[in-house]
Swiss-Prot record:
The keyword Plastid applies. It is found in: Plastid, Chloroplast. Residues 1-45 are annotated as: Disordered. Residues 32-45 have a biased composition (Basic residues). NCBIfam families: rpmH_bact. The gene is rpl34. This is Large ribosomal subunit protein bL34c. One of its GO terms (molecular function) is structural constituent of ribosome.
Amino acid sequence: MSKGFSNGTNIKRVRKSGFRARMSNSSGRKILNSRRRKQRKKIAL
């Protein structure tokens, strides 16, 4: 079972490279779209 992201270091990871962080600016949205194009299973953390 996964731990979620309540641990200290994981909060930093999620804030920097999580889905909502990527959606917050245009370059992040470009990253998500390129990962969707490659059909990645995970598009964000």
